[in-house]
């Protein structure tokens, strides 16, 4: 599991934890828990939702770790918009791919703030950012955990000061699978599905040595500029 600190955002959401699991055996049970938790009420419902308070992403549709990180950063930037004047030009992709947001002009991070989202919460907003279209139902179906998911990326929008060990233990209590390093993400990429979703078939016709890298760049760029255009 990797952890990233984004101090410019409200402390309740400023620590991001991402983990990659392969050979996941309980995807249907994860989906069932998510659905049941969303329908429960009272203290029991609060506890059930806290136990599955993660973003679950179909890892076979991720082309790199940067793909996920850019979607996470874009989600936070949309949820907690800047209060300063808008920049004349959008930041270069290289700045987003290696995000340093400490200098961004954001609303006060000392206040408890609720994120602004177009969907139900930050987790579904993340799935929407990963999708090339704005159909929330479609983005959840494609990019969220499904009954046949075996490679799963798990995201925690955590609080400043959260113990990394406790976050990981909470993930393991939900996901039955093998934790692997993010350097292995590209091994599981389902390029046939990625090509269809992001409409990359024209790049396949190039048949150049760096075709895969060009497609990877195209996917990341699509996610990076989604909230700009």
Curated annotation (Swiss-Prot):
Component of the EKC/KEOPS complex that is required for the formation of a threonylcarbamoyl group on adenosine at position 37 (t(6)A37) in tRNAs that read codons beginning with adenine. The complex is probably involved in the transfer of the threonylcarbamoyl moiety of threonylcarbamoyl-AMP (TC-AMP) to the N6 group of A37. CGI121 acts as an allosteric effector that regulates the t(6)A activity of the complex. The EKC/KEOPS complex also promotes both telomere uncapping and telomere elongation. The complex is required for efficient recruitment of transcriptional coactivators. Residues 87-120 are annotated as: Disordered. The keyword Nucleus applies. GO terms for biological process: tRNA threonylcarbamoyladenosine modification. It holds the Pfam family CGI-121. This is EKC/KEOPS complex subunit CGI121. Keywords: Activator, Chromosome, Nucleus, Telomere, Transcription, Transcription regulation, tRNA processing. The keyword Nucleus applies. Component of the EKC/KEOPS complex composed of at least BUD32, CGI121, GON7, KAE1 and PCC1; the whole complex dimerizes. It comes from Cryptococcus neoformans var. neoformans serotype D (strain JEC21 / ATCC MYA-565) (Filobasidiella neoformans). Belongs to the CGI121/TPRKB family. The lineage of its organism: Eukaryota, Fungi, Dikarya, Basidiomycota, Agaricomycotina. It is found in: Nucleus; Chromosome, Telomere. GO terms for cellular component: chromosome, telomeric region; cytosol; EKC/KEOPS complex; nucleus.
